[in-house]
Amino acid sequence: MKIGSASSYALIENGDIVHNYRRISKNRKDYEKSCENYREGTDTSSFLFHCVAMTAALCGDLWIYPKSFRCSGLLIWPVYVNFDLDESESGEYAKQAAMVCGKALLVNPLSKEPASRGGAFFFENGKVKQSLGLDKEGVLVVEV
């Protein structure tokens, strides 16, 4: 595999990397103007974390390759959206997540520049079960 940059995230516990996921879908960047070293990942396999089977996805992965992410445990889905994830919009994300997994945790960063509204959502069977509001810091605690 060639070395390059990637859109990725890692699940870390006690300083150890438990799982390192690299986005498999192309992001919205202009590839004509971007670094030629950018690489998409290929691994969508599940992993165990505290005896729970988990699958990782990033941003547009579930919209483009939903069949690659079938899981029986919990889907972890960090996204970057800078629009209001209101009830109807978060409901669309819940339905998309349900195509691959019965339970999903969607997390959006909170930042001023670039603007991102934050928020965290726990989806179960295509419905929003719990959420942390937009535009504020906090922790969403869910039982899986």
In which residue ranges do the predicted regions lie?
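Active-site catalytic loop in hydrolytic enzyme cores
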Residues: 2-73, 86-89
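Short acidic-glycine loop/turn motifs at beta-strand connectors
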Residues: 12-16, 123-127, 144
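Generic detection of short hydrophobic beta-strand segments and adjacent strand-loop junctions
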Residues: 47, 140-144
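CN hydrolase (nitrilase-like) catalytic-core segments centered on the catalytic cysteine
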Residues: 63-139
